[in-house]
Amino acid sequence: MSLTSGSPDNTHPVSVEKSQSRKVLGATSLAHLFHDGATDLHYVLFAIWQQQFGLSMAQIGLLKMLFSGAMSAFQIPAGELGRKYGERKVLMAGTLLLTVALLLYGTSSTLIQLMVLIVIGGLGASVQHPLSSSFITQYYSAKQSRIALSTYNFFGDVGKGVIPSTLSACLLIISWGSALQWIALFGFLVTLGLYLLLPVGSKAAQAKPLAAKETHSQPHQQALNIPEPLRRRAFSALCVIGSIDNATRTGTLTFLPFLMAARGASATQIGFALTLIFIGGAFGKLVCGILSTRLGIIKSVAASEIITSAIVLGMAFAPLHVIWLLLLPLGVALNGTSSILYGSVAELSRPQQQTRAFAIFYTASLGCGALMPVIYGMAGDVMGVQQTLILVALLVLCILPLLIPIRSATRYSGQ
């Protein structure tokens, strides 16, 4: 046996620190998997609730707004609560709150009860992104955190595919309420995992938890050297583009299931259809990232939005068997644009105000994503689901002229 194997030298603290970092990454990735999966699970539930409660399209949009609104509005307060009471406690409490909401969905006998539970679930889901990303930045160096955050993001995409498809599979043999009980059981196990893996002595005050996707999406880039009026116009255009892009995603995912149901798809088939879109979305981040390096930001965004518009428009008129063929490409185009837009926020903001710029960008984007399903829902009640999806497809094309200020800014800087 080596004489140094048991010596209390510096290797022991380093190994302990690495072990703790791995536990933190494992715990936060597990939380991301559950929270993102449980969030996108609602797209399957909306179609079920529409039949059970006899909801209109506007009411479905309202349910989506309640969850997304609660989740987006409470992210910054969640960071403050984490700093005050401890990130570990708040993250566990949020996970438990979301789990309890899922567990009680099946007991709802009225729409009001369901709406209250949806708000509770949204509040619980709000804590995961800011606090998990804060944990990772505390326990990993700048270079290591990029890899760790990529791993963390990957598990979020896994959750979006696995949990909705699990619900869909369970619907073949049990009721949706019973299926949610099994998913809630997984949520309780995730909470237990957070209790066992996350460190008790995390000092949140030493870190700055950022809202939602800001920490794990923000690239380390320098701002473009451009005149301030040009920067403002370009950044304003970028915020509007992000808002329309997010509204397109939420609108499509909320109302496409109803189009498929009208053409003969069962609740189980709709769940698997959404899973295919989420799988395509995971690949979309990679595909659009590669495109942006080869074609540039402007051409990549224009191409992805035109493709999104064409696919959504095609689905509005296509029979069910053709819609199935378009689901994966839709996911690629629908989810890929956002990864390109995130990289432009840092470039089009002032060097000392990038954190504020991300806060403005995500507030506009998430706010529009929460509000537009209600507007689309009211349109659906008047025009029908098919015409609503046509409206969604046409609205995407409004992004194209908004790219002009951004192109002017990048050309001025010589990029």
Question: PLM features: what roles do these ranges have?
Answer:
Residues 8-19, 205-238:
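Juxtamembrane intracellular "pre-TM" segments in multi-pass secondary transporters
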Residues 40, 68-76, 161, 278-282, ...:
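Residue-level signature of mid-helix packing/kink "hotspots" within the transmembrane helices
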Residues 42-43, 233-282:
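Extracytoplasmic gate region of multi-pass secondary transporters
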Residues 49-50, 81-82, 169-174, 260-261, ...:
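Interfacial helix-cap and linker-helix signal at transmembrane-aqueous boundaries
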Residues 74-86, 285-296, 380-381:
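Helix-to-loop junctions at the C-terminal end of transmembrane segments
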Residues 89-103, 299-313:
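Structural signature of the two symmetry-related core transmembrane helices
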Residues 117-156:
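Cytoplasmic helix-loop-helix junction between adjacent transmembrane helices
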Residues 152-202:
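Helix-loop-helix hairpin linking two adjacent transmembrane segments in secondary transporters
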